[in-house]
Amino acid sequence: GATVVAGGLPAKARNSGAKIASSSVLLFLDADVVLPVDFLEQTFYEMQARALDITSCFITPRSKLRLDKFLHHFANYYMRMTQKFHPHIPGSCIFVKSTLHKTISGFDESLFMAEDHDYLKRAKKMGKFGYLKSYKIPVSVRRLSEEGRIKIALKYIAVELHLLFIGEIRKNIFEYKFGRHFKS
């Protein structure tokens, strides 16, 4: 049984869900994620076996286009290479112990973008992080298709440069749209 909670930007929606959750592990998923059949069982087992407090999977596109595969492979490589000094976590799939979520006061709702990376940065200071090896999470390429692959790649590069040299993103300075496809 699922409960629908008030949404908003991702940080607010995730925090709203976490407030009513009763599990010892929270799982935050994007609305368009389609999980493989035994995904939850295998990933939860791996999280426990490796004693991870916060984790995620690398990503794979739900697309057969070579460019999509390359872009997602590059994103995974970048996440792997920067995890020690500038950690990233795909917001499409985040597992976290509920105690850790509470300890770091959840997601920062004042951030417009990259709230997931900020969340991981704070969580890593208090708990053990690692990427899961058992699965890559299949993610939608809808945004790539709609906005254009080069345009969105350049936008993500601009976001990264902003995070590295200026800081958190608290306004929609990159014309990034959320939740357009799931309005009722």
Regions found by a protein language model. Give the residues of each.
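Short, flexible, basic/aromatic active-site loop/helix in glycosyltransferases
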Residues: 56-91
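Glycine-rich, basic loop-to-helix element that forms the pyrophosphate-binding segment
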Residues: 5-21
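Acidic donor-binding loop at a coil-to-helix junction in glycosyltransferase catalytic cores
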Residues: 113-119
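Conserved donor NDP-sugar-binding/catalytic core segment of glycosyltransferases
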Residues: 37-67
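Conserved nucleotide-sugar donor-binding
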Residues: 22-23, 90-104
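Hydrophobic helical membrane-anchoring modules
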Residues: 125-184
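The conserved acidic donor/metal-binding loop of glycosyltransferases
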Residues: 30-34
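Short aromatic/hydrophobic "clamp" motif used to bind/position activated sugar donors
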Residues: 26
